[in-house]
């Protein structure tokens, strides 16, 4: 198996049979609720409602800058927000410890989604133990 490294954490390239996987790409399709972009599951964090998991994830990147978090909250479209706040101009304002926090923060955000939304828990239950994959690549043979 090939080794990849993302944020200092080794990952492996794996192959799955079609019947072993639940994949999602678009929020309006069957498994779209698994996407961080899904507005079906707003999250309450520290008394603030974040429209999507992506909004809360991005807010974590800039937690030392409440003015940026406020800007993130003004954008309803999660994909636009993600693209906007991943630009180079914002890089100096990202938490200096973000590389080590981004995966634990994402786990926390996903746990909030699970805890706060019974319908998300039901969606997860419908996967029947299958591997859940975000179809975020254009590689030939990766689309279900």
Model-derived regions, located:
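Charged, low-complexity intrinsically disordered segments
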Residues: 1-144
């Amino acid at each position: 198996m090939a080794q990849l490294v993302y944020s200092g954490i080794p990952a492996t390239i794996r192959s799955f049979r079609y019947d072993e996987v639940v994949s999602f790409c678009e929020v309006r399709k069957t498994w779209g609720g698994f996407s961080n972009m899904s507005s079906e599951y707003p999250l309450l964090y520290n008394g603030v409602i974040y429209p999507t998991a992506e909004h809360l994830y991005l807010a974590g990147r800039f937690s030392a800058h409440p003015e940026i978090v406020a800007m993130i909250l003004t954008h309803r479209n999660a994909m636009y927000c993600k693209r906007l706040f991943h630009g180079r101009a914002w890089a100096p304002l990202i938490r200096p410890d973000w590389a080590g926090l981004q995966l634990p923060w994402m786990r926390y955000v996903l746990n909030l989604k699970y805890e706060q939304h019974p319908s998300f828990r039901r969606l997860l239950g419908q996967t029947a133990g299958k591997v859940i994959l975000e179809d975020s690549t254009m590689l030939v043979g990766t689309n279900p």
